[in-house]
């Protein structure tokens, strides 16, 4: 499936021809290079291994350098992602935004903002206890255990804990504008992650659903 590695710049708004204001997220793309291939004959499926953003020289080890020894003019990359189902490119090829010209909807994967340790009401949208005078558990979780049987709290019970910092995919975001000169696209709506975080942009898997 066609995809690129991009960077979330932030949100703004644009006016459509009919005067409607549309909130958009700006996503920038540094050059994306094919740094490896997988084939049905050798690996059981077709895929391209893509890389973006040059790795700092202090982070480049000999094993990493060896992976790029057969690639001319391609430096080791910080972000490396495998896109399944893609073929027709060779190692060392650059894939630009022209690949998205005919695409109207995309799926974007990113890491959500970390919120730190949060209570059950914020983390899981629990209603909490009574807010009025006399209650002693306004924002408490409530009971988590069972009766005599099974006499324990089950694993996975929703409780307070670390919130955010998880991988999340938003599907069917409309591509509002593509600026090939500035290597950027505008997509309608919000995208997971903080400003400057890197995201994976793929052709929408379930258009119209």
Curated annotation (Swiss-Prot):
Lineage start: Bacteria, Pseudomonadati, Spirochaetota, Spirochaetia, Spirochaetales
Region Disordered, residue ranges: 127-151
Cellular component GO terms, alphabetical: cytosolic large ribosomal subunit
Pfam families with a match to the protein in the record: Ribosomal_L3 (PF00297)
Source domain of life: Bacteria
GO biological process: translation
Annotated keywords: Ribonucleoprotein, Ribosomal protein, RNA-binding, rRNA-binding
GO molecular function: rRNA binding; structural constituent of ribosome
Transmembrane region(s): none
Coiled coil: none
Quaternary assembly: Part of the 50S ribosomal subunit. Forms a cluster with proteins L14 and L19.
NCBIfam families the UniProt entry points to: L3_bact (TIGR03625)
HAMAP family in the record: Ribosomal_uL3_B
Family membership noted in the UniProt record: Belongs to the universal ribosomal protein uL3 family.
Known function: One of the primary rRNA binding proteins, it binds directly near the 3'-end of the 23S rRNA, where it nucleates assembly of the 50S subunit.
Protein name (Swiss-Prot/TrEMBL): Large ribosomal subunit protein uL3
């Amino acid at each position: 499936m066609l995809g690129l590695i991009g960077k979330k710049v932030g949100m703004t708004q644009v006016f459509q021809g009919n005067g409607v204001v549309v909130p958009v997220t700006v996503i920038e793309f540094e050059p994306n290079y094919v740094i490896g291939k997988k084939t049905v004959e050798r690996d059981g499926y077709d895929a391209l291994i893509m890389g973006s953003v040059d790795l700092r020289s202090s982070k480049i080890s000999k094993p990493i350098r060896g992976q790029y020894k057969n690639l001319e003019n391609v430096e080791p990359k910080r972000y490396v992602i495998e896109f399944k189902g893609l073929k027709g490119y060779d190692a060392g090829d650059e894939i630009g935004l022209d690949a998205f010209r005919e695409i109207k909807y995309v799926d974007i994967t990113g890491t959500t903002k970390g919120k730190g340790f949060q209570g059950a009401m914020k983390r899981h949208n629990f209603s909490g206890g009574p807010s009025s005078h006399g209650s002693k558990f306004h924002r408490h979780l409530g009971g988590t255990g069972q009766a005599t049987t099974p006499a324990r709290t089950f694993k996975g019970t929703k409780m307070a804990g670390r919130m955010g910092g998880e991988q999340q995919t938003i599907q069917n975001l409309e591509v509002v504008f593509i600026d090939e000169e500035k290597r950027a696209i505008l997509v309608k709506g919000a995208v997971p992650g903080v400003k400057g975080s890197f995201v994976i942009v793929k052709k929408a898997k379930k258009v119209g659903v």
